[in-house]
A protein has these predicted regions:
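Hydrophobic transmembrane alpha-helices of multi-pass small-molecule transporters
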Residues: 60-63, 107, 175-180, 204-209, ...
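Transmembrane helical elements of multi-pass membrane transporters/channels
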Residues: 16-35, 137, 148, 171, ...
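Helix-terminus/linker motif at the lipid-water interface of multi-pass membrane proteins
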Residues: 30-49, 118-125, 181-188, 248-277, ...
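Small-residue-rich hydrophobic transmembrane alpha-helices
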Residues: 48-108, 145-164, 271-335, 368-382, ...
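Transmembrane alpha-helix boundary and packing residues in multipass membrane permease domains
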Residues: 21, 25, 37, 74, ...
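Short alpha-helical transmembrane segments in multi-pass integral membrane proteins
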Residues: 1-18, 76-141, 185-241, 297-363, ...
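N-terminal transmembrane alpha-helices
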Residues: 5-42, 56-71, 75, 100-107, ...
Length: 447
């Protein structure tokens, strides 16, 4: 079902639209969490460390797929909000075609270069074989990942956040079962974890594309259908490329931080891997909700309702802030119990590493509600330069401080770089929001 985000109470509209997206990303995170859970519990600590070590590299591919998602989604939602349905359909097919070409190039790079990258980040010898095998299988599944993300972007652009939720709920649940089957019954080791994700993402991708095709065909339009447009691809790229660069820089920064963590040994890597999975449940959820806020802003911008864009800030902060507070309480009160899901011992270096990481960063989660709401509104309004500036400042500080603090304070110094980077990025994002979107809407209201 398509939803018009340009009418109704901004708070109610955003909550109704974004909550299914929140459910979707929770199930999306089950893919990676299930891999680590099964690896840690059924194979061993080194397997957990190998999957976690590989995960930081897979984030580069996820950065490109997220960029394709947000680029297509923002442009499709803009034409949907403007009721220009024929051009909207051109945007959908152009996004899909462009994504296929990009994905093919990335598959070649991944299959040829991932092992070299594992060496570059100082992967311990005992983790190398499993890490490389996991990455090779993951790379083969990139078409499923990319096309599924574009399909999800189309759904959210049309105001439908429920359908992606249903797909992810089914495929994520199946992934857990297939993970256990391949590892416990077939004894495939880390490769079994990767093949389970490959299979379940493939089924989800095919089904989502089929539903998208039916949904887009059902939208009434007039005139000749254009399947691919270079001009449209350029519009999508204007939004997608900054998002790809932003996410890629974040991924590269995380890889640099991972290389610092790797110097402390397999147990620290395992603890960091488990804690990162938990942290990424929140970060990925907030990022996805931020893209929902972008769609809200883009539809209203297309409809000429700038004042509703400004009203979305308060609604977005309340939504994201409530989620941040829940996760802060959860990780501070039950961090050890959650980390135990990945490990077999309640004590030891691995679990203590993960617990210290969570206890250091969780109290600062609320900062992200303000930053990602502002970022989402700026991205939806096409202010990509400002959006990138806030993220890169955060990333730069995190990487530099992780290196410096680790040399002064040891491994625990690495974790301090997160709250410092978040604080600076949030301040910049709020300043940019106040001097752009907020001021424009305020001036329009007073005319």
């Amino acid at each position: 079902m398509n939803k018009d985000l340009t009418v109704g109470s901004p708070s109610k509209v955003l909550w109704q639209f974004c909550l299914p997206m929140f459910g979707s990303i929770l199930f999306q995170q089950l893919y990676n969490i299930a891999d680590s859970l099964v690896a840690g519990k059924l194979i061993g600590e080194n397997a957990l460390a190998a999957v976690g070590n590989s995960y930081e590299i897979t984030l580069i591919f996820l950065a490109f797929s997220f960029g394709c998602n947000i680029g297509g989604s923002v442009i499709v939602s803009r034409y949907f909000g403007a009721k220009d349905y024929n051009t909207m359909k051109t945007a959908v097919t152009t996004a899909l075609i462009g994504t296929v070409v990009l994905c093919g190039a990335l598959m070649a790079v991944g299959l040829l270069g991932c092992r070299s990258l594992l060496v570059l980040i100082r992967t311990p010898a005992e983790l190398m074989a499993d890490s490389a095998e996991y990455l090779d299988i993951y790379t083969l599944g990139l078409p499923f990942l990319f096309l599924y993300n574009v399909a999800t972007g189309v759904f959210t652009a049309l105001g439908d956040s429920r359908t992606p939720f249903l797909f992810l709920a089914g495929s994520s649940t199946a992934n857990i079962a297939v993970d256990v089957l391949f590892v416990a019954a077939f004894d495939l080791g880390v490769a079994g974890v990767a093949w389970a994700t490959f299979l379940c993402q493939g089924v989800s991708c095919v089904l989502s594309l089929w539903v998208v095709a039916r949904r887009v065909r059902a939208v009434p339009s007039e005139g000749e259908r254009v399947w691919f447009s270079w001009k449209m691809l350029g519009q999508i790229a204007v939004v997608a490329i900054p998002s790809i660069l932003q996410q890629s820089f974040v991924s590269v920064g995380n890889i640099i931080i991972q290389s610092v963590v790797n110097s402390f040994g397999a147990s620290v890597i395992a603890g960091f891997a488990a804690a990162t999975k938990l942290n990424n449940v929140l970060i990925s959820s907030l990022t996805t909700l931020g893209s929902g806020i972008s769609n809200y802003a883009s539809q209203n911008l297309g409809a000429g309702k700038n004042e509703r864009v400004r009203a979305g800030f308060g609604a977005g902060v309340k939504l994201l802030g409530s989620i941040c507070l829940c996760f802060t309480a959860l990780y501070l009160l039950a961090g050890r119990q959650l980390l135990m899901l990945f490990m077999n011992s309640p004590t030891g270096e691995a679990i203590n590493t993960g617990l210290t990481f969570l206890q250091t960063i969780a109290p600062f989660y609320l900062l992200l509600a303000f930053k990602l709401t502002s970022d989402g509104l700026m991205r939806g309004c096409g202010m990509m330069g400002r959006f990138m500036a806030t993220t890169l400042s955060d990333l730069f500080l995190r990487v530099v401080l992780a290196i410096l603090f680790s040399s002064w304070l040891g491994v625990n110094g690495i974790w301090l770089s997160w709250p410092v980077g978040w604080f600076v990025g949030t301040v910049l994002s709020m300043v940019f929001y106040r001097t752009s979107i907020h001021r424009q809407a305020e001036e329009k209201t007073t005319l």
